[in-house]
């Protein structure tokens, strides 16, 4: 097995970090690796806000109370970004259409691909991290904190640092429940219940809810109002 695949299969989320900085040279490598991710038509429809000051991390923690943010050596906010595209379009026409859902898919996928590259690069250098999607629940406040202009929105953040904890790799769904030959196959409730048991066994005494219960908590409720409100304010919907 290649070193790259071994590293990818060993991934765990790290939420506790030592009080050590990430050297600028390593940050440059991580962020340059992020830039090399695939991108729709090479539009590179995302930006990254790098946060290293404790004051800014503390302010962010007040909005998104995840200890990993406060402890991180560096926090990367990945932003879906059509602001740059708007400026490019204006060189040729007065009409700019961010394209609603399609524009959101383009920017979100570009950001996600770059973010995964960044995390993998960080792990290859001995760092750890966790992707934090809860930033979207405070989209309006984050837009103000980070001075995000029109046609931009927070997609997720990554807290990075020197790991101060170790976990076993979290079991994923069986491959046959995710990869289908030739055509889609709907899942049975038995397959969901089986994975509930796998996840509960993995979590042990830490288990408070099952995997399917967490699905119900997420998708049994309306979308967060802040996300849509910010997208409308930033002229993306």
Regions inferred by a protein language model and the residue ranges of each:
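Acidic, surface-exposed loops and disordered segments
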Residues: 1-237
């Amino acid at each position: 097995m290649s070193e790259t695949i071994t590293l990818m299969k060993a991934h765990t989320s790290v939420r506790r970090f030592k009080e050590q900085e990430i050297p600028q040279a390593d940050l440059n490598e991580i962020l340059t690796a992020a830039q090399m991710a695939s991108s729709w038509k090479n539009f590179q429809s995302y930006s990254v806000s790098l946060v290293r000051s404790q004051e800014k991390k503390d302010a962010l923690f007040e909005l998104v109370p995840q200890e990993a943010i406060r402890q991180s050596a560096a926090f990367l906010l990945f932003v879906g970004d059509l602001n740059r595209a708007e400026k490019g379009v204006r060189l040729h026409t007065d009409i700019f259409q961010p394209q609603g859902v399609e524009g959101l898919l383009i920017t979100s996928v570009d950001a996600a691909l770059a973010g995964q590259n960044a995390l993998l690069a960080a792990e290859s250098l001995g760092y750890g991290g966790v992707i934090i999607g809860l930033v979207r629940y405070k989209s309006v406040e984050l837009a103000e904190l980070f001075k995000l202009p029109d046609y931009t929105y927070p997609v997720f953040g990554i807290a990075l640092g020197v790991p101060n904890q170790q976990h076993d790799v979290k079991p994923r769904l069986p491959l046959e429940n995710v990869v289908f030959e030739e055509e889609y196959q709907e899942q049975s409730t038995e397959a969901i219940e089986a994975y509930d048991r796998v996840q509960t066994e993995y979590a042990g005494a830490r288990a408070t809810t099952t995997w399917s219960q967490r699905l119900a908590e997420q998708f049994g409720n309306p979308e967060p109002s802040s996300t849509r409100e910010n997208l409308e304010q930033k002229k993306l919907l």
